[in-house]
């Protein structure tokens, strides 16, 4: 069989196993907390028994763990079920995305180790209550901006792709967080560039009286660079409005000035040149340059329960390899995902003709994304490795990986290694008044 036929065979297998999500779309708010989980996932397991029923998530921290400690893998005793690699990828093609198939076939040694499925993700009752309330109040603008709704997932029973994307844009990653993060950018010819910094985040969207506190911005970020030397002291602040494009400012230490960055949106190239601004965090910003639709729902092998990417023994040097991250550190499980496709709108500049997100039913988080170039060829591939943080409670990213399959380069982002601080309930450190240009300048002068 030719490589082209093998590739098309994988795509065909994927398409044939796709289920239309009509039954899910026919549900209503009374099903939340019953046949559906409080955020809209199917509560029941699958017929094969390979996906268990959701039983509330793993809400208890690992014995002995305390806030500020590196993570302990609560599932370290799980035995690997099997591995997917170039020798058997076609056997599993019906439960893989086209991007997963392509990266396995492209890079010798790339594999996916599959473990028993654990539906570990859960949230607070306050988020569940707000999610149910949003079923009668949530409203989007024509651009996909948020006109009403707060405190939980906006559309637990989405009627269209735009609503599904809105669920991710408003996903819970903590009210106040303080993270010491690293990212790497692989270089042509080998090696990587390392960036480190501190990210402070405030999400007024998740305040109990969110719209009274801040009716313009739903999430606010400040990043202060600590490496490399040329970047030390530089600060970037990004504010995400409910109903407008992201707004960003930069602080330049040498000038001691704060300047607004008017173009840091959509497909503006990032520092790494192999990722656009709106690829960050899998996808961010207004979704108004794509037509979005729900393709369906299916079972997919996805990264999950990635606590091993946050243990005290993890080091950049044993995670980052030439073409892809160390496969010994990645855990995959079988989960149900929503497939949401965005097709570029005519009349707008778009780097990608199409983006396909595979969104975890229990969190609305894209765990896998396939991105296509303007000739409709698969070009970039993204993965989001998440884990459950019971102290929040909620599932958050342990690492994001962004692959350019033409350039053979990748970005590893949101890494927190060794004893680096990861505080997901940082109200004692992060304050709501930090997120202004004036406060940003004062922060830079410290």
Give the ranges of each region predicted by the language model.
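Bacterial N-terminal signal peptides that target proteins for export
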Residues: 2-11
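Gly/Pro-enriched, hydrophobic low-complexity segments
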Residues: 29-57, 84, 97, 222-241, ...
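Solvent-exposed N-terminal domain segments of exported/luminal and surface proteins
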Residues: 29-246, 252
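Extended beta-strand-rich segments in extracellular/periplasmic secretory proteins, especially
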Residues: 180-184, 193-229, 280-357, 367
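Long, C-terminal catalytic modules of enzymes
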Residues: 420-446
């Amino acid at each position: 069989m030719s490589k082209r036929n093998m590739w098309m065979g994988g795509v065909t297998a994927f398409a044939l196993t796709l289920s239309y999500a009509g039954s899910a779309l026919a549900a209503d708010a009374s099903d939340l907390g019953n046949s559906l989980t409080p955020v809209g996932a199917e509560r029941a397991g699958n017929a094969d028994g390979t996906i268990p029923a959701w039983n509330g998530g793993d809400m208890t921290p690992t014995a002995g763990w305390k806030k500020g400690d590196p993570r302990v893998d609560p599932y370290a005793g799980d035995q690997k079920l099997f591995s997917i690699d170039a020798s058997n990828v076609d056997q599993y093609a019906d439960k893989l995305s086209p991007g997963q198939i392509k990266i396995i076939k492209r890079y010798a040694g790339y594999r996916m180790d599959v473990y028993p499925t654990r539906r570990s993700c859960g949230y607070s009752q306050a988020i569940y209550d707000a999610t149910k309330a949003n079923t009668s109040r949530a409203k989007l603008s024509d651009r996909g901006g948020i006109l009403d709704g707060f405190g939980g997932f906006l559309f637990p029973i989405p009627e269209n792709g735009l609503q599904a994307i809105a669920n991710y844009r408003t996903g819970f990653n903590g009210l106040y967080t303080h993270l010491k993060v690293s990212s790497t950018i692989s270089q042509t010819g080998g090696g990587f560039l390392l960036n480190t910094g501190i990210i402070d985040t405030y999400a007024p969207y998740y305040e109990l009286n969110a719209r009274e506190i801040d009716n313009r911005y739903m999430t606010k970020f400040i990043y202060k660079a600590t490496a490399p030397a040329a970047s030390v002291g530089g600060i970037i602040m990004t504010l995400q409005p409910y109903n407008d494009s992201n707004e960003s400012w930069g602080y330049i230490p040498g000038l001691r000035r704060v300047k607004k960055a008017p173009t840091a949106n959509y497909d503006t190239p990032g520092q790494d040149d192999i990722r656009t601004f709106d690829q960050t965090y899998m996808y961010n910003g207004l979704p108004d340059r794509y037509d979005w639709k729900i393709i369906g729902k299916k079972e997919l092998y996805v990264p999950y329960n990635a606590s091993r990417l946050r243990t005290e023994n993890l080091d950049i040097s044993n995670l980052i390899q030439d073409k892809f991250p160390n496969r010994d550190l990645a855990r995959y499980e079988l989960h149900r995902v929503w497939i949401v496709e965005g097709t570029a709108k005519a009349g707008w500049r778009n780097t990608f003709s199409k983006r396909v997100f595979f969104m975890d039913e229990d969190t609305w988080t894209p765990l896998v994304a396939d991105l296509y170039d303007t000739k409709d060829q698969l070009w970039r591939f993204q993965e989001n490795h998440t884990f459950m943080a019971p102290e929040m409670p909620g599932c958050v990213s342990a690492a994001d990986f962004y692959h350019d399959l033409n350039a053979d380069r990748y970005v590893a982002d949101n890494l927190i290694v060794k004893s680096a601080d990861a505080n997901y309930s940082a109200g004692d450190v992060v304050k709501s008044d930090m997120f202004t240009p004036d406060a940003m300048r004062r922060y830079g002068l410290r």
